């Protein structure tokens, strides 16, 4: 008990947001480390190396157009836009934290993708003949996926941490992601094309666990900056639209060429469309006078894309995709209305962006849908070759049957949750140390501590908020059941 009390006392020391030494030191040292590690380990793969001509002749490839670049790069472009524009602008809803939302998103994504190429390369792309990691366009897509988990986690602690803390969060998050991805995809042999388990479930619970460890009992001192204003919600909606439009590319980017990739895009497209309607319906039903809440429209409309990710390449059927989107729109929106305030009040989890409702819960639903769909697969639906190709029943897993594959899918979901929660608690303990330059409770959700602001912004008084992503609004009875004031 004495050690615990000493640790708490240490962590409760006065805050100092001056990162003039720590932030440049971390950026310079870690970037130099990346240069050295890339020099030692990273090389072009056979499709991006100058020996491609020889490889093409050896494999009897007739044209350069068959290079993987031309198959994957359109999807890579879409995923890249989602990472840097979609996630970045989605988090600009806070009235005084737009620089931090977009700028720090940019920072940790740029660092994270470099570290991800190394970590994922050591697990998946290491050539044991020369000890080098061979990278191509698919490696870039996987690195962006890896970064997405950390950006999801950032949403839980948005406005409450320093850029140095975010770099540490990303360093450990990428490392944990690479390990859990290897366990789920390679050892357990679960399929997760759109990352419902590997990306969203892990990233969601990783961020929530960190937020729980960094709980601020006096965060209400920054409540005047915790909401949005009209123009900040419009900017956040831009992020939503970019994510919504490109999510079919996200879920299909690394699936097998041909029918699997085609099917993944269709399933995601339909799930997203269905989610929009149910989100609007629930938002109107549970708000006073039937008005829509922009929080729900910005976030819950994307939940279907998250939940359909694992089963995106399976024979989910178009109506099945619509059902997944329908259910997720309801669950995610109700999560914002009831679950987020409950978690803050009773579980001490301050979830700034509501990632539990957009990523964690839909990710778990996606894992469950994937397990059920895999277990229900049959030769009559998939065909013999289709079943083998879709679930990769080859090599050590050639005797696998669909029902057993369903169990492996469920096991993969459990691993993602355990890594997210366990890793988040450990990293949260590290981030609680008073050496990272995080803001005081009365200075959160504010760009001023870390950014040079225009003079008119520095002197501007706080704007009264009209929309708060974390507010516990009063609930009153209506003819439909419950309604919010």
Swiss-Prot record:
One of its GO terms (cellular component) is apical plasma membrane. SUPFAM superfamilies: Ammonium transporter. The chain crosses the membrane at residues 21-41, 74-94, 99-119, 139-159, 168-188, 194-214, 234-254, 266-286, 300-320, 322-342, 358-378, 411-431. One of its GO terms (molecular function) is ammonium channel activity. Residues 42-73, 120-138, 189-193, 255-265, 321, 379-410 are extracellular. GO terms for biological process: ammonium homeostasis. Its main location: membrane. Glycans are attached at residue 60. Specifically expressed in the gill by mitochondria-rich cells. It is a multi-pass membrane protein. Pfam families: Ammonium_transp. Keywords: Ammonia transport, Cell membrane, Glycoprotein, Membrane, Transmembrane, Transmembrane helix, Transport. Belongs to the ammonium transporter (TC 2.A.49) family. Rh subfamily. This is Ammonium transporter Rh type C 1. It comes from Takifugu rubripes. The lineage of its organism: Eukaryota, Metazoa, Chordata, Craniata, Vertebrata. The gene is rhcg1.
């Amino acid at each position: 008990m004495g050690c615990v009390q000493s640790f708490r006392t240490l962590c409760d020391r006065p805050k100092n947001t001056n990162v003039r030494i720590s932030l440049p030191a971390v950026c310079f040292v870690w970037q130099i480390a990346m240069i050295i590690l890339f020099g030692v380990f990273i090389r072009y793969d056979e499709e991006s190396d100058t020996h491609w001509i020889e490889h093409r002749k050896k494999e009897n490839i007739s044209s350069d157009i068959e290079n993987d670049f031309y198959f994957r790069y359109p999807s890579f472009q879409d995923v890249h836009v989602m990472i840097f524009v979609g996630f970045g602008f989605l988090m600009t809803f806070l009235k005084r934290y737009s620089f931090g939302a977009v700028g720090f998103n940019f920072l940790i994504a740029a660092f994270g993708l470099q570290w991800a190429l190394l970590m994922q390369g050591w697990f998946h792309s290491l050539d044991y003949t020369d000890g080098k990691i061979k990278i191509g366009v698919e490696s870039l897509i996987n690195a962006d996926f890896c970064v997405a988990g950390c950006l999801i986690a950032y949403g839980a602690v948005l406005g409450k941490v320093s850029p140095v803390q975010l770099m540490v969060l990303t360093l450990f998050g990428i490392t944990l992601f690479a390990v859990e991805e290897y366990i789920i995809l390679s050892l357990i042999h679960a399929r997760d094309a759109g990352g419902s388990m590997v990306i969203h479930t892990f990233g969601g619970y990783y961020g929530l666990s960190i937020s729980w460890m960094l709980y601020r009992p006096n965060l209400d001192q920054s409540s005047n900056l915790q909401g949005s204003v009209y123009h900040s919600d419009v900017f956040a909606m831009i992020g939503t639209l970019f994510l919504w439009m490109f999510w079919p590319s996200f879920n299909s980017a690394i699936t097998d060429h041909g029918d699997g990739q085609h099917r993944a895009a269709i399933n995601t497209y339909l799930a997203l469309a269905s989610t929009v309607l149910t989100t609007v319906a629930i938002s109107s039903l549970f708000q006073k006078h039937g008005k829509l809440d922009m929080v729900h429209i910005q976030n819950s409309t994307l939940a279907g894309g998250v939940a359909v990710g694992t089963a995106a390449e399976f024979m989910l059927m178009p109506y099945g995709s619509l059902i997944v989107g329908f259910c997720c729109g309801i669950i995610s929106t109700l999560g914002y209305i009831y679950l987020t305030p409950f978690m803050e009040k009773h579980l001490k989890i301050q979830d700034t962006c509501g990632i539990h409702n957009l990523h964690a819960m839909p990710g778990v639903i996606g894992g469950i849908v994937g397990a059920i769909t895999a277990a229900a697969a049959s030769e009559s639906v998939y065909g013999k070759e289709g079943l083998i190709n879709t679930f990769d029943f080859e090599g050590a897993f050639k005797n696998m049957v669909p029902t057993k594959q369903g169990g492996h899918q469920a096991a993969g979901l459990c691993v993602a949750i355990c890594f997210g929660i366990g890793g988040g608690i450990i990293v949260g303990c590290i981030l609680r140390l008073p050496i990272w330059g995080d803001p005081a409770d009365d200075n959160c959700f504010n760009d001023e501590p870390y950014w040079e602001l225009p003079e008119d912004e520095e002197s501007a008084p706080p704007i009264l908020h009209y929309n708060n992503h974390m507010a516990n609004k009063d609930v009153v009875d209506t003819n439909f059941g419950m309604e919010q004031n």
